[in-house]
Curated annotation (Swiss-Prot):
Pathway: Porphyrin-containing compound metabolism; protoporphyrin-IX biosynthesis; coproporphyrinogen-III from 5-aminolevulinate: step 3/4. Catalyzes cyclization of the linear tetrapyrrole, hydroxymethylbilane, to the macrocyclic uroporphyrinogen III, a precursor of tetrapyrroles such as chlorophyll, heme and phycobilins. This is Uroporphyrinogen-III synthase, chloroplastic. CDD domains: HemD. The lineage of its organism: Eukaryota, Viridiplantae, Streptophyta, Embryophyta, Tracheophyta.
Length: 302
């Protein structure tokens, strides 16, 4: 699917169609409920985009889309729960010293901070992936005594760039603690290990699919021309729901390349993602997907 030459988005090209062309939004107006809500100026029109992050974490995206007169349906598809190593984190921080702590997502940052505080705020140096992850540490950095320092972020907000660019701080063994989702791949730890780092990975949280999806919310969600996803886990959860209809084939707008690659592996065709992960690029990806599906948006009138 070609984009204009001025676009910075990188959609996967559309091969001969195995899915029908995306349907425009329509067919049903969902009521507000426990698992989703419309965001609109007055009575809710059919949604333009379904936003799928964990409950409480969609507000910034919804607000950014509202500026473009894009109607969002909030349908949280995943939630974060404790991982098998959650309880070990504070003890490891107390008992061992690391040259780097690598944090790759806002959720990993939030879980790490809980363990770090429980360990008595030991001195740590953090490497982060993404501006959103770094922002989780802002308040702590502002008020702590310098024991926590965010000292590195890679040139591109992706795990493979962190693995290839993280600087060594010693000529001898350089120790890295990697608190991660239990569902995260091994790209970072393998990449660092191949460069001679000694990596300790702790699976401090994981994601599970939300089970109680209101059918009255799901119906308009399945008709929306674009679904926005921020992780392979959310994508899998959406595809499980979309399997209830024949040949669902509307657009997927991914927060970054990792999720987009997962979408391609699942056989989806209409996939959009920004070159640099983050909110602004994600919004542009959603707008590009809407334009491609004949849903061009103007500034809101209310």
């Amino acid at each position: 699917m070609a984009l204009s030459s001025s676009s910075h988005l990188l959609p996967f090209s559309r091969p001969p169609a195995t899915f029908p062309r995306a349907r425009h939004a329509g067919g049903g107006r969902g009521r507000a409920g426990a698992t989703g809500r419309f965001i609109a100026c007055s009575s809710p029109p059919p949604p333009d985009v379904v936003v799928t992050r964990e409950r409480g974490k969609n507000a910034k995206l919804i607000a950014a889309l509202e500026k473009h007169n894009v109607q969002s349906l909030e349908l949280p598809l995943i939630k974060h729960v404790e991982g098998p190593d959650t309880d070990r984190l504070s003890a490891v921080l107390r008992d061992e010293k690391f040259d780097w702590i690598t944090i790759t997502s806002p959720e990993a940052a939030a879980v790490f901070l809980e363990g770090w505080k429980a360990a008595g705020n030991p001195k740590v140096r953090i490497a982060v992936v993404g501006a959103g992850t770094e922002r989780v540490f802002d308040e702590v950095i502002q008020y702590n005594d310098g024991s926590l320092e965010v000292a590195f972020s890679p040139s591109k907000a992706m795990g493979k760039f962190l693995a290839s660019e993280l600087p060594r701080t010693t000529e001898t063994t350089c120790k890295v603690l990697y608190p991660a989702s239990a569902k995260a791949g091994h790209e970072i730890q393998n990449g660092l290990s191949n460069r001679g780092f000694e990596v300790t990975r702790l699976n401090t949280y994981t994601t599970v699919s939300v089970q109680d999806v209101d059918p009255l919310i799901l119906k308009p969600a399945l008709s929306a021309p674009v679904v926005a996803v921020a992780s392979p886990s959310a994508l899998r959860a959406w595809l499980n729901l979309a399997s209830q209809v024949d040949n669902w084939g509307n657009a997927i707008a991914c927060i970054g390349e990792t999720t987009a690659s997962a979408a391609k592996k699942f056989g989806l065709k209409s996939i959009y993602y920004p070159t640099t992960p983050g909110l602004d690029g994600w919004v542009e990806s959603i707008l590009e997907a809407l334009r491609a599906h004949g849903q061009s948006k103007e500034a809101p009138g209310c």
